[in-house]
């Protein structure tokens, strides 16, 4: 059994996710096991565009963007489960639903968010995942996320 880590740098992430600045919220994948789990990070900088209005005096990363980043990590795991090489042309994973989202503390500039997403099940192109976002080992957000695989015209 190999202890080799499966990682993804930003160049590879860009091949899988359609998101671009300012909405690409995953900086690196630290490890993944197709069909099982994926760990990724987001470095939170004061230069993030959302900090201009949320909130100028006490900058806090919006919770919906923490969930969006978690959903992007989920999409990467779904793609890597489907095909470990390159993403198939004309296929996207859409955010289909969320349950039991909980926020436990704020995320501020200078934090590094570690995402850990686990695949619970997949059936007929609908995947169900559980994710946690942590800063310094402390859970800041957790949720069950659903995504749907769809063919798109190119």
Swiss-Prot record:
- Is Signal found in the keyword set? no
Transport recorded as keyword? no
Provide the E.C. number(s) assigned to this enzyme. Answer: 4.2.1.59
GO cellular-component terms in the record?
A: cytoplasm; membrane
SUPFAM superfamilies in UniProt: Thioesterase/thiol ester dehydrase-isomerase (SSF54637)
GO-annotated molecular function:
(3R)-hydroxyacyl-[acyl-carrier-protein] dehydratase activity
Q: Name one Pfam family in it.
A: FabA
Primary residence: cytoplasm
Alphabetic keyword roster:
Cytoplasm, Lipid A biosynthesis, Lipid biosynthesis, Lipid metabolism, Lyase
* InterPro entries, sorted: FabA_FabZ (IPR013114), FabZ (IPR010084), HotDog_dom_sf (IPR029069)
The places in or outside the cell where this protein is found are: Cytoplasm
Highest taxon above the source species:
Bacteria
What chemistry does it catalyse, as a reaction equation?
a (3R)-hydroxyacyl-[ACP] = a (2E)-enoyl-[ACP] + H2O
Active site residues of this protein: 54
Task: Give GO terms for biological process.
Answer: fatty acid biosynthetic process; lipid A biosynthetic process
Q: What does this protein do?
A: Involved in unsaturated fatty acids biosynthesis. Catalyzes the dehydration of short chain beta-hydroxyacyl-ACPs and long chain saturated and unsaturated beta-hydroxyacyl-ACPs.
User: Its family?
Assistant: Belongs to the thioester dehydratase family. FabZ subfamily.
Q: What is the protein name stated in its UniProt record?
A: 3-hydroxyacyl-[acyl-carrier-protein] dehydratase FabZ
Question: What gene does this protein come from?
Answer: fabZ
């Amino acid at each position: 059994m190999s202890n080799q880590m499966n990682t993804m740098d930003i160049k590879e992430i860009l091949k899988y996710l359609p998101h671009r600045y300012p909405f690409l919220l995953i900086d690196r994948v630290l490890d993944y096991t197709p069909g099982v789990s994926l760990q990724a990070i987001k470095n939170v900088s004061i230069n993030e565009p959302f900090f201009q209005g949320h909130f100028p005096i006490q900058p806090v990363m919006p919770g919906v963007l923490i969930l969006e980043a978690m959903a992007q990590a989920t999409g990467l795991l779904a793609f890597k489960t489907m095909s470990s090489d390159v993403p198939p042309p004309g296929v996207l994973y859409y955010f289909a639903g969320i349950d039991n989202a909980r926020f436990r503390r704020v995320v501020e500039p200078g934090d590094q968010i570690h995402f850990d997403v686990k695949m619970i099940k997949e059936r007929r192109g609908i995947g169900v995942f559980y994710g946690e976002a942590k800063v310094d080992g402390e859970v800041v957000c957790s949720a069950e996320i659903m995504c749907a695989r769809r063919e798109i015209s190119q």
